[in-house]
Amino acid sequence: MYLPRLYLQRTSHALSRLSRLSRSSSKLCTSQFVLHPTRYFSSSSFPMSSSNTDALVEVAKARRSYYKLGKTSPVSDAKVEELVNNAILYLPSSFNTQSTRVVVVVNDKHDKLWDIAIEQFGNLVKSGAISEDQWNNQTLPKLQGFKAAYGTILFYEDPAHIAPYSEKFAAFKDKFPIWADHANAIHQWFLWAGLESLGFGANLQHYNPVIDTAVAKEFDVPSDWRLISQLVFGSIEGPAGEKQSKPLEERIKFLGGK
């Protein structure tokens, strides 16, 4: 399994810091006032420091798109499930709609997902929507590459949990679906970075809506859930590509600083 030295150094260093922070936060939370059955409040319950911030930044730096993935998992499936559960429990959503949904498929279920994708796109080849050349040289090799990985997280939005807020706050009715996508993106980034901090490589795909109906039927997903993206993860079998960044001056305005 390919693990670049810089990746290992950054991730190991960041995880060590975050582990210490987690233990510290757990001790603090046990003595805090309960404001909600699953929430605790204290101005000191998350003791931020420059070292903790540095650890978070290192996790962000280590997150990359890895496309050459394998079927070896560095952790137990229970550890992956724990990460997903924490994402759903603690990540924010606009107006606390909590409309993000995820379906995690690993092992044979993961293989089935990408078999479905291959079948659905194969139908587009038969109909002439995709050329044989594009299919054989681009689309099929990509889909087979995703199947070669260990698992996939499917990200959905549940409109049923958005509609009541659109009705209650009519002035923002057209904004709630957009804000839901924002919340979904937060979940995507957290789980992408989280999986890579566990030792996986990952890449984010968008093969909806071509696969939506067949996937919903196969995995018993409610038909009204809206598929947003697919996060493919597995053992790192090759390096990530070089990352190009546009100048910060073109992308940031920092005003009123002292």
Features from the language model and the residues they span:
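Short, hinge-like loop/turn segments at secondary-structure boundaries
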Residues: 120-121, 221-223
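C-terminal helix-cap and adjacent tail motif
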Residues: 52-60, 65-67, 226-258
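A generic local secondary-structure boundary/capping motif
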Residues: 141-144, 217-221
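Acidic-glycine-rich active-site phosphate/pyrophosphate-binding loop
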Residues: 126, 155-170
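N-terminal amphipathic, basic helical "cap/leader" segment at the start of enzyme domains
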Residues: 2-6, 28-29, 36-151, 256-258
